[in-house]
Amino acid sequence: MTTTELVALLHLASPALPIGAYSYSQGLEAALDANLIRDADSARDWIASGLTDVLAHGELPFLAHQLARWQTHDTHALAAENAWFVASRESAELRRETEQMGWSLAQLCASLEWGDAARRATLASLSPIALPTAFAYAAAAHDAGADATLAAYAFGWVENQTSAALKAVPLGQLAGQRIIVALRGAIDAAVRRALATPPDAVNTFAPQLGILSARHETQYSRLFRS
């Protein structure tokens, strides 16, 4: 990996990326309301479970396959698999989340003119667009490899979940850093598992997350949009 590719992925994983990630907790706030999260240890366990049991089986391998589609510019597969992922979201708010963040990242890619004109036209044609599809486009535009792309995406997800826990539980900054450090190895394992997952084995089935997310839509007091 070149320094330029590394910096591009650090940019994509940064919480400063203007796609609205900070406003979503992806079920963490509902888990807190259901008393599944009570403190730093239970927050760490919840985030670890989301990484190893949900992302590693679904979102990360999907991202890897979409990266390959962008690299070969397989427009038919890109559109079909993007539509499948959007339809697979477990609740209305999780669907809105991936659509809003995907749209925001796609707009950023277009505004910064990342990628060639033909691929930018394909990107613009995908509506709604899932976040992993847009993230894969941005990574492909910077010639990033699959392993580094998935690691950046997973780290960004862990960091955002930890940030949500800091606000909602609440936790202190040191507790948040301990969670991130504790999950470094889990990120590596999730990436390796995702890279070994063929397209027909991508699995987004997450019933507990779906139920919690649906409950969150009518939760009395909320900080986050999911």
Swiss-Prot record:
This is Urease accessory protein UreF. Signal peptide: none annotated. UreD, UreF and UreG form a complex that acts as a GTP-hydrolysis-dependent molecular chaperone, activating the urease apoprotein by helping to assemble the nickel containing metallocenter of UreC. The UreE protein probably delivers the nickel. GO terms for molecular function: nickel cation binding. InterPro entries: UreF, UreF_sf. HAMAP family: UreF. Required for maturation of urease via the functional incorporation of the urease nickel metallocenter. Keywords: Chaperone, Cytoplasm, Nickel insertion. Belongs to the UreF family. GO terms for cellular component: cytoplasm. Its main location: cytoplasm. It comes from Burkholderia cenocepacia (strain HI2424). It comes from the Bacteria. Disulfide bonds: none annotated.
